Amino acid sequence: MAAIITPAIPQDLIDFLHKYRVFLIAGHKEPDGDCIGSSIAMSLFLRRLGKETVLLSAGPFQRPEIQAYEALFSAHVPDALKERPDEVGAIIVDCSGIDRTGDLAEQLADFPSICIDHHATNATKSVGSLVYADAPSTTFIIQSIIEHLCGSVTKEEAEMLFFGLCTDTGFFRHLDDRSGEVFAYTARLVQAGANPKYTFAAMNGGKSFGSRTLISRVLARMKPYYGGKLIVSYETDQDRQEIGVENRDSDMVYQLIQGIAGVKAICIVRQDTETHCSVGFRSLDTVDVSSIAASFGGGGHKQAAGLYIEGTVDSLIPRFVEAFASQLEAAS
C-alpha cells in the first residue's frame, strides 16, 4: 500500500472558503474527538481569515472527552442566516454528507456545501469537497488545508488537530509503516503548542466507576466465532439503566478484546432503544469492516466502522456473524 501523503488541496475548495462571509460547520451525529477537533480547528482557522462561523452538532455529546466542548455548538441554524443563504456556506466534516448530520440535515440542505472527510465509504463527488481515505483522521486533512493557505497552525488550532488525530489513531496505535508523514504533521502540531501528555490525560482520565462496570459486562458476554477470529458481544438498555451510565469507553473495550490471541475482528452491538441498535466493528490488518458496515447501511474505515440499524441484539448478531464469513473463512 502507498504511503500516506499530504493531500492536494482543490482550487474549488479554496474558492469556496473565500466566497462566503459566514460558514456553518457541522459533523456527524454522536460526535467523537475527530469530529469535534475538525469542527473547532476549522472554525478557528476561518476566523483567522476574517470569516464568521457557527459550530453545529446534533449531538449527543456522550463521550466524556468531548463534553467540555458541547457549549461551543448549537443544534440549530440561526434564523437570521436562513434569510440570507447567499452569504452562507456549509462545511461538513468527518462524514460523507449532510444526511449524516442527524437532525441538522434538513436545516443545512438549503445552503451550498462542501465535505471534508477521510472515511473509505465516502462517495462524495461535489465540487470543492476533499475526501482522502488514506488520511488517519479528518484533522489531518484540515491541517493540510490550514498549512497550505496560512503556512502554519496556531497553538489553539494545533491542540484541536492533535486531539482529533489522537482519537482516530488510538493515540497512534493504529498507524503503520506508511505513516511517516503523519508523524511529521504531529511534530509540527507539538511544536505549535499541542501537549501530548495533557491530551492523553484528557482522553483517558476521569472515567466513572460505572463505565468500568459496563465494560465488565460487555467482556463477560464475549462469544468467539470462526475459531476465535471474530469476537462478538453486546450491551442492553437495561445495563445502562442499572449502572447509571451512557458511555462504556468504547476504545478501551476494543483495545482489551484486540489483545486476545488470534482475534482478527470485533463486533459489539448496543441496544439503544427497543427497536434500534448501534453497532461498532473493529479489525486488525486484513479484515475490511467498512465493507461489512456498508452492506447494512453504515460506513467507516477498513479497520473501524459502524452503523445504526433497526433490530434487536438477538436478531442482529446472527446476521453480523454471517457477514464476516467470506473474509474470515477465507483467512482460515
Language-model regions: role of each:
Residues 116-185:
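Short alpha-helices
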Residues 70, 74-128:
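Active-site cofactor/cluster-binding pocket
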Residues 32-34, 94, 117, 168:
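Acidic active-site catalytic centers that drive phospho-/nucleotidyl reactions
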Residues 33-39, 98-101:
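Short glycine/serine/threonine-rich phosphate/pyrophosphate-binding segments
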Residues 41-43, 107-110, 131-132:
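Glycine-rich, phosphate-binding/catalytic loops in enzymes
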Residues 2-30, 37-67, 83-88, 167-295, ...:
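Hydrophobic helix-and-loop "lid/oligomerization" segment in the mid-to-C-terminal part
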Residues 33-37, 134-137, 157, 249:
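A generic structural signal for residues located within well-ordered alpha-helices
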Residues 79-81, 102-105, 129-131, 150-152, ...:
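A generic local secondary-structure boundary/capping motif
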